[in-house]
Amino acid sequence: MNNFEIKYLIADQYINSILKGESFDLNLISKKLKIDNSIIQTLFPYSEKINKLEYLNIFNSKLDDEILILINKEIRDEDATYFEKILEAFFIKFENLDKYKRALIILSSEKKDKLLNFLILNNQNHKFILKLMKCCGDKDLYFKLNIKATLLNSLYIKNLNELLNREEITIDKIMSNLDKDLKKVFELPFLFKN
């Protein structure tokens, strides 16, 4: 098992421990997974608080990569519009996040944690959206891509905030909101002409 696989495994273990309401201990995890503890300590050498941010970062990055690979396979030969491809990717991302909603709420329960998580995930999601637009066939220059990614990221954050802060909201409602929001944004012809 290589270091990337170990990191992904540890991040998954961390998120799953939150979902199950179990405590998380790297020493116990190393025994459970039969991985040398010194390797795990080398990969995650920081304080527990910093390591938790790293687990979240790795977990989200893995989700993003899986979504991009799935989208690339599904849309490669599809005759869908640029809008439909972006919308589909957002739907898939929110369906995946909904599975981990409880863990994400717990990780963002304190205001200071919410800010740190926001900063990490905002930057990471911006990169995800840039890759997604390229995957969907966007050929605009990098500057324009960044403007579009910032706009799309703001829609993502708005809907993620609703998902995590409103207990009664359903994934169907989030998807309906995303559809409406994206349609408004795609009406900006100087940005979205694809």
Region locations from a protein language model:
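Hydrophobic alpha-helical connector segments
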Residues: 71-102
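Amphipathic alpha-helical segments used for helix-helix packing
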Residues: 96-116, 133
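Short, amphipathic alpha-helix enriched in basic
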Residues: 2-37, 45-52, 56
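Hydrophobic alpha-helical segments that form the core
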Residues: 143-164, 178-184
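Short, basic, alpha-helical segments at the C-terminal edge of helix-turn-helix-like DNA-binding modules
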Residues: 56-68
